[in-house]
Amino acid sequence: MTERQELGSLEAMLFAHAEPVETARLADALRLDADEVTTLLQKLQKRYDEQESGMVILYFEPDRWQMTTRPYYGEMVKRILDTRRNAPLSPAALEVLAVIC
């Protein structure tokens, strides 16, 4: 796997996991050494910061990582989530609720 693919794999795993995940678990999934994964994660952090990306990679003690939205964009994210929450239920969703009740 190329470094670009390793970085992409880490992004995908962090995005899908949503919660902080241990370096060892990421290393196991990539079949890489934990130190290599830490170096890759630090590269991702730097890239996101340099690009002023809407996403950020956070590090938590002891040795966990998480992808999340950058705080600067929090208000906009909140607005879109509030809009989605107030959306009416689709006919299919109403049908499912009718079956459950």
Tell me what each language-model feature is.
Residues 1, 74-85:
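Short, Lys/Arg-enriched N-terminal segment that forms or immediately precedes the first helix
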Residues 43-75:
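Charged low-complexity interaction tracts in eukaryotic proteins
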Residues 16-22:
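Short capping segments at the starts of secondary-structure elements
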Residues 10-15, 88-101:
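Short amphipathic alpha-helical interface segments
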Residues 33-43:
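Short amphipathic alpha-helical interaction segments
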Residues 25-29:
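A short acidic, leucine-rich amphipathic alpha-helix
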Residues 1-8:
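Phosphate-centric recognition/catalysis
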